[in-house]
Amino acid sequence: MANLGCWMLVLFVATWSDLGLCKKRPKPGGWNTGGSRYPGQGSPGGNRYPPQGGGGWGQPHGGGWGQPHGGGWGQPHGGGWGQPHGGGWGQGGGTHNQWHKPSKPKTSMKHMAGAAAAGAVVGGLGGYMLGSAMSRPLIHFGNDYEDRYYRENMYRYPNQVYYRPVDQYSNQNNFVHDCVNITIKQHTVTTTTKGENFTETDVKMMERVVEQMCITQYEKESQAYYQRGSSMVLFSSPPVILLISFLIFLIVG
């Protein structure tokens, strides 16, 4: 890890040093550097426009470019660009009109639902989170009757599980046991409230289904937890901290 960080540091130092030198090189020419941008004008540093009797370029009476009476570009009476009577750009008022500020976009319900779909903390359940929807697993119960019963009634069983963060458990078995209990309890209460009851066969099948889903949820959460821990270790190593500090110095400087 240290060797990798050192090589990354050397590579970024070389790249950003070259970019920093490029930024500091003076650019030739440019606006107001003394060079004439129009043919037939005076010496460098002189007036960029031909002398007129108080008017704009090619105008006899002080008007704007192509205007006879002091108007803005394309205006006869002092108006702003595209306005006939003294208005600002696109406005009929004075010169202090502000731009029209667009209204803030409204947050759609689709975005709000997507943000709360995965891992949302469920209120009133003591820190439990609701996992993403899963496909119900195909399970064989050992006899044709139960297999057929499961296929015909699987839609009545949960497709999401309740769980707590994996770092609150010492092993997978504890996580799965708690996950199964709270999920079946919540699903049973909700379904019973709607007037539907479960038989012993339903409870048996739900336990098997929810157990498989809780194992899948544990594997998913464990992998995410490990990746977060690895990222923290990487960014806390001295070479990476030095590299990030150097990049910030180059950007700010």
Swiss-Prot record:
GO molecular function: amyloid-beta binding; aspartic-type endopeptidase inhibitor activity; copper ion binding; cupric ion binding; cuprous ion binding; glycosaminoglycan binding; identical protein binding; microtubule binding
Keyword Membrane: yes
Keywords: Amyloid, Cell membrane, Copper, Disulfide bond, Glycoprotein, Golgi apparatus, GPI-anchor, Lipoprotein, Membrane, Metal-binding, Prion, Repeat, Signal, Zinc
InterPro entries hit by this protein: Prion (IPR000817), Prion/Doppel_b-ribbon_dom_sf (IPR036924), Prion/Doppel_prot_b-ribbon_dom (IPR022416), Prion_copper_b_octapeptide (IPR020949), Prion_N (IPR025860)
Residues at which Cu(2+) 2 binds: 69-71
Residues the entry annotates as binding Cu(2+) 3: 77-79
Binding site for Cu(2+) 4: 85-87
Positions of the propeptide segment: 231-253
Ranges for the Sequence repeats: 51-59, 60-67, 68-75, 76-83, 84-91
Region (Disordered): 26-108
Span of the signal peptide: 1-22
Biased composition annotated in UniProt, kind: Gly residues: 52-95
Subunit structure comment from the entry: Monomer and homodimer. Has a tendency to aggregate into amyloid fibrils containing a cross-beta spine, formed by a steric zipper of superposed beta-strands. Soluble oligomers may represent an intermediate stage on the path to fibril formation. Copper binding may promote oligomerization. Interacts with GRB2, APP, ERI3/PRNPIP and SYN1. Mislocalized cytosolically exposed PrP interacts with MGRN1; this interaction alters MGRN1 subcellular location and causes lysosomal enlargement. Interacts with KIAA1191.
Disease affiliated with this protein: PrP is found in high quantity in the brain of humans and animals infected with the degenerative neurological diseases kuru, Creutzfeldt-Jakob disease (CJD), Gerstmann-Straussler syndrome (GSS), scrapie, bovine spongiform encephalopathy (BSE), transmissible mink encephalopathy (TME), etc.
Name this polypeptide is given: Major prion protein
Organism: Macaca fascicularis (Crab-eating macaque)
Taxonomy of the source species: Eukaryota, Metazoa, Chordata, Craniata, Vertebrata
